[in-house]
């Protein structure tokens, strides 16, 4: 799949990214090379190869799932300017 100059400008417009004509030309080349690499990857025969969840066959050592911090809600809410019913009241941002 070939990327054209108009495709780059349209993508920039949709992403709300300011992009000059000279910058777009550079991105056309870069994106075309990226898509060529993707095409090469898709051409590889992966039949019979199990999918990987992670490229390394290592297990992660996890710490025990123990409570290390206790509930301090009342202490933290005492510092807040306004609370009600255990909730923090904040100024309205969206009308």
UniProtKB/Swiss-Prot annotation:
Which GO molecular function terms does the record list?
asparaginyl-tRNA synthase (glutamine-hydrolyzing) activity; ATP binding; glutaminyl-tRNA synthase (glutamine-hydrolyzing) activity
Name the keywords, alphabetized: ATP-binding, Ligase, Nucleotide-binding, Protein biosynthesis
Q: Its Gene Ontology biological processes? A: glutaminyl-tRNAGln biosynthesis via transamidation; regulation of translational fidelity; translation
Q: Which InterPro entries match?
A: Asp/Glu-ADT_sf_sub_c (IPR036113), GatC (IPR003837)
Reaction it catalyzes: L-glutamyl-tRNA(Gln) + L-glutamine + ATP + H2O = L-glutaminyl-tRNA(Gln) + L-glutamate + ADP + phosphate + H(+); L-aspartyl-tRNA(Asn) + L-glutamine + ATP + H2O = L-asparaginyl-tRNA(Asn) + L-glutamate + ADP + phosphate + 2 H(+)
- Report which superkingdom the organism of origin falls in: Bacteria
Per UniProt, subunit arrangement is: Heterotrimer of A, B and C subunits.
Family, according to the entry, reads as follows:
Belongs to the GatC family.
Q: Which PANTHER family match?
A: GLUTAMYL-TRNA(GLN) AMIDOTRANSFERASE SUBUNIT C, MITOCHONDRIAL
Protein name from the UniProt record: Aspartyl/glutamyl-tRNA(Asn/Gln) amidotransferase subunit C
**Organism in which the protein naturally occurs:** Chromohalobacter salexigens (strain ATCC BAA-138 / DSM 3043 / CIP 106854 / NCIMB 13768 / 1H11)
